[in-house]
């Protein structure tokens, strides 16, 4: 019965509807009573008299049953009406104590918060005030014990967005406000810091729109400064040159993690009538947590795509963040982000993917991040961007510690057009003191044009070299990596 919901208004409406049905039936029964209970005899013979008497008896029995049914109907309608009244009374009785309790709670909080509100401008318990729209006003700080920071207000024309308010002991930072529009867009506000014990950093505000100039930069994500919490996401860059030739705004970086938590993701670069904006870098982990993902580069409608942000560094026990994807460009593709390095124990982040440069050169894939200083694998390299000048695959990250495998090289991008080769495969990363080298990336596909595979990574002391990546359309396969100096076998060359 916990899922049963009763609406007194609905019950009362149903009772009224049923009462109308009963009234209509009573009218119909009354109209039918006279012609059915007193039938005229068709003839003077006994058969006609008996038939008329039989039908009259049926009619009288029907009227008797109808009277009983209508009596039951009236009782049912009365019960529904009474139920609606009782439910409404119960709701009223329950609402009054709850409203009184809420009033008492608010009064208590007002009394408790009054001293610190007067002295420090912030409550003990409660959320900070939000900044007003179109003012660029900063969000208020959250309660000293509990409460989120207020959100920053959006900026007016040529005005930066407000910063998000900081939390107190427990709570999340407020969001940064969106930057205001202008000939050049204004900056988005930074996200507020998370609580000293628990809480995430607030996201940064997006950059403002540039009507003929550059888009505004996105605000940085707030840091998680306490024990538990993740960094805030960086704000995306503003759109640039909607009526002109401006560049996209650069995105904000992700916030740093708490001791236990992940770095914030970098924001995406803004779209530009000329070049795309830069993607924001991923925030770093601190103790136990991963680095944030790098933001993608922005689209350059008549120029180059924006370069992507790099992945954040992993914490002591954390993976590096993946690099962002380069921005699409009308001329050149934006550079891919590099994967973040791990801390002491974990794996490097993957390199970001390259991007198409529709008028000239597509970008190569990003290099994978290095593995942990004690043990951990290198991150894989990113894919090369496709195009008429396809990008090469990214190199795999190295395993720099005691144990670990080198990261695999990324595949080359596909070549577009007659006789256009694909990109070369990326080389594999080297292994740890004990560990194998990474596999070389395969060559990108092309129009019957030869392209080469990447080389396998080398082992160091104990381990096998990585295999070379395959070539394409007669292009050479990558060389196998060398085996360990103490023990190990060389990698197999890739097929052509």
From Swiss-Prot:
The keyword Secreted applies. InterPro entries: PE-PGRS_N (IPR000084), PGRS_rpt (IPR048996). Residues 461-480 are annotated as: Disordered. It comes from the Bacteria. Belongs to the mycobacterial PE family. PGRS subfamily. Gene3D superfamilies: HP0062-like domain. When expressed in host mitochondria, induces mitochondrial stress which results in mitochondrial membrane depolarization, up-regulation of mitochondrial superoxides and release of cytochrome-C in the cytoplasm. The cytochrome-C in cytoplasm triggers the activation of caspase-9, caspase-3 and caspase-7, leading to the apoptosis of host macrophages. Being a late expressing protein, apoptosis induction by PE_PGRS1 may facilitate the M.tuberculosis survival and silent expansion of its niche at the site of granuloma. Its main location: secreted. Residues 4-94 form the PE domain. One of its GO terms (cellular component) is extracellular region. Contains 7 GGXGXD/NXUX calcium-binding domains. Keywords: Cell wall, Host mitochondrion, Secreted, Virulence. Induction: Expressed in lung granulomas of guinea pigs in late stage of infection (90 days of infection). It is found in: Secreted; Secreted, Cell wall; Host mitochondrion. This is PE-PGRS family protein PE_PGRS1.
């Amino acid at each position: 019965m916990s899922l049963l919901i009763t609406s007194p208004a609905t019950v009362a409406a149903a009772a009224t509807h049923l009462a109308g049905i009963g009234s209509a039936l009573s009218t119909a029964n009354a109209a039918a009573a006279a012609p059915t209970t007193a039938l005229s005899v068709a003839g003077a013979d006994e058969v006609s008299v008996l038939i008329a008497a039989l039908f009259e008896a049926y009619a009288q029995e029907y009227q008797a049953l109808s009277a009983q049914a209508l009596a039951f109907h009236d009782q049912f309608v009365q019960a529904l009406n009474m139920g609606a009244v009782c439910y409404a009374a119960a709701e009223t009785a329950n609402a009054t104590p709850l409203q009184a309790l809420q009033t008492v709670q608010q009064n208590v909080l007002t009394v408790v918060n009054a001293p610190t509100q007067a002295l420090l401008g912030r409550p003990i318990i409660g959320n900070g005030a939000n900044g007003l729209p179109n003012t660029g006003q900063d969000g208020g700080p959250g309660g000293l014990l509990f409460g989120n920071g207020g959100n920053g207000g959006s900026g007016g024309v040529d005005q930066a967005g407000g910063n998000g308010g900081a939390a107190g002991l427990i709570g999340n930072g407020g969001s940064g406000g969106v930057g205001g529009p202008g000939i050049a867009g204004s900056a988005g506000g930074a996200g507020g810091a998370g609580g000293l014990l628990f809480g995430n950093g607030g996201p940064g505000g997006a950059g403002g729109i540039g009507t003929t100039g550059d888009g505004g930069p996105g605000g940085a994500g707030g840091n998680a400064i306490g024990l538990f919490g993740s960094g805030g996401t960086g704000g995306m860059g503003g759109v640039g040159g909607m009526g002109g030739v401006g560049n996209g705004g650069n995105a904000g970086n992700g916030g740093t993690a708490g001791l236990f938590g992940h770095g914030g993701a970098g924001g995406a670069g803004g779209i530009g009538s000329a070049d795309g904006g830069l993607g924001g870098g991923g925030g770093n982990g601190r103790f136990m947590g991963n680095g944030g993902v790098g933001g993608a580069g922005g689209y350059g409608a008549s120029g180059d795509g924006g370069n992507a942000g790099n992945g954040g560094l992993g914490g002591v026990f954390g993976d590096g963040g993946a690099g962002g994807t380069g921005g699409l460009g009308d001329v050149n593709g934006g550079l891919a982000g590099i994967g973040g390095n791990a801390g002491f124990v974990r794996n490097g982040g993957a390199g970001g993917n390259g991007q198409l440069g529709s008028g000239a050169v597509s970008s190569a894939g990003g290099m994978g991040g290095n593995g942990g200083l004690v043990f951990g694998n290198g991150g894989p390299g990113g894919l090369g961007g496709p195009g008429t000048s396809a990008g090469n695959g990214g190199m795999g990250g190295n395993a720099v510690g005691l144990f670990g495998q080198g990261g695999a090289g990324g595949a080359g991008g596909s070549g577009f057009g007659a006789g256009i080769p694909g990109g070369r495969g990326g080389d594999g990363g080297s292994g740890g003191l004990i560990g194998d080298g990474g596999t070389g990336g395969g060559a990108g596909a092309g129009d019957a044009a030869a392209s080469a595979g990447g080389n396998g990574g080398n082992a160091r002391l104990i381990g096998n070299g990585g295999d070379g990546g395959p070539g394409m359309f007669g292009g050479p396969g990558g060389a196998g990596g060398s085996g360990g100096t103490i023990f190990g076998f060389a990698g197999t060359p890739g097929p052509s």
